[in-house]
Each structure stands twice: as structure tokens, then as C-alpha cells.
Amino acid sequence: MNTLRAAIVPGLIAGVVSIFASWFWMGFVFHRYQRATPETWRPEGPRNYALSSLVRVLSAIAISVLYVLVARFHVSFFADGMVGALRFAAAIWIALAAPVAIEAAIYVRMHSMVVLGQVIDWLTTAVLACAVTFVWTAA
């Protein structure tokens, strides 16, 4: 099975689940901190939610594809079962998502708890993408 075929379904599953996880983190747990910097945020609406959901699903698919590529080449640190999948999720998160959120907060006025929420939110997406992909490809 080729890499994209092996990763697309688990990536879609993880992406859809991560939309709800994102709602939990950013829409429920950390949303109240956005009020500290109201001038930073655009008005929210259905279009915003649809676009951010699309970004979330595509990101989960991309992470799944990268994980399948790395696991298939038996990179020992990342090919060690579920633990390896979680290591890969952490590496992707540390390399991409966390620095983007943290660096944006340096230049854009955001409450520190919103930044923490974004970082946790993207860690959740990376973990879901890698864990679901591992379970899917191991079956």
C-alpha cells in the first residue's frame, strides 16, 4: 500500500477528532482569555470555523503521511510501536507547531494562556494523527 493511501483515512479520522479537541481547548478551556486582547481577534462565524476545520484536517493528514514515511523506513526512534508514534508527534510539534504559536505571540498581542491553549491544541492534533495512524497501519 502506498504512503498516501495508508495515511489518508487515519489522517481524516484524526483530523475530525482534532476539530472537536480544538473546540474543547480553544473554544471552552482557553476562550475566555481572548477577551484580554479583543483588538487582536477577528469576528467569528461559520466561514472561520469551516476554514479552520479544513486546516486542521489537512494538517492531520500531512502529519499522518510524514509518520507513515518515517515508520516505513524503520527509523528506530520513531518506529518503536505506539511509543515511537508519540515520539514522532512530539518531534513534529516541537519542530513546527509550538515555535509558530510561541513566535507569533512575541509579535502579536495575545494573552499567554491563549498561546498555551494553541500549543496544547496542536500537540493534541499531532498526537491524534500519529496514534490513529499507528493503530490503523498496525491492524
Where are these predicted regions, by residue range?
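Juxtamembrane/disordered regions of integral membrane proteins
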Residues: 1-139
